[in-house]
């Protein structure tokens, strides 16, 4: 039996120095922090848009409940929540607290006020102007 001994070649292994490793870690961390800030801002905007769509849906749903049941309904906005007695909608963190406001719907589904509902986000103001009688609204958005 022949014993074959293979000699292993030694490859020079070059490793990063501590300074190079720290530099790479710093650059990668800086990039990740920069990207997470823009992702967070985008997430907040999407969350706000979904809130406004849900608010409009809740407003119209309360109208339909009032009309279908021939009952008076109210949509209550208080603090950080909107409720019609059956459903609740919480404010996203980026929206400021809202003063207490109640919108009354009559048995025909219309409201009896010309009130404005104003929501303040970090970078814009969203105003819902309610029309009396028919229960419709006009949404306007202003920066700042």
What are the roles of these predicted feature ranges?
Residues 13, 46-53:
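Residues at secondary-structure transition points
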Residues 2-6, 34, 38-49, 64, ...:
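N-terminal helix-rich module
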Residues 25, 49, 56:
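Conserved catalytic core of two-component sensor histidine kinases
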Residues 54-61:
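Phosphate-interacting basic helix/loop segments used at nucleotide- and nucleic-acid interfaces
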Residues 1-39:
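N-terminal single-pass transmembrane signal-anchor helix
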């Amino acid at each position: 039996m022949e014993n074959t001994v293979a000699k292993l070649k030694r490859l020079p292994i070059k490793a990063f120095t501590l300074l190079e490793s720290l530099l790479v870690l710093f650059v990668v961390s800086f990039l990740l922090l920069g990207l997470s800030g823009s992702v967070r801002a985008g997430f907040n905007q999407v969350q706000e848009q979904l809130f406004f769509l849900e608010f409009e849906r809740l407003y119209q749903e309360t109208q339909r409940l009032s009309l279908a049941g021939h009952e008076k309904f109210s949509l209550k906005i208080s603090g950080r929540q909107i409720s019609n007695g059956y459903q609740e909608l919480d404010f996203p963190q980026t929206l400021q607290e809202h003063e207490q406001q109640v919108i009354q719907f009559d048995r025909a589904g219309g409201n009896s006020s010309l009130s404005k509902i104003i929501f303040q986000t970090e970078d814009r103001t969203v105003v819902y102007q309610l029309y009396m009688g028919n229960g419709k609204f006009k949404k306007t958005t202003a920066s700042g």
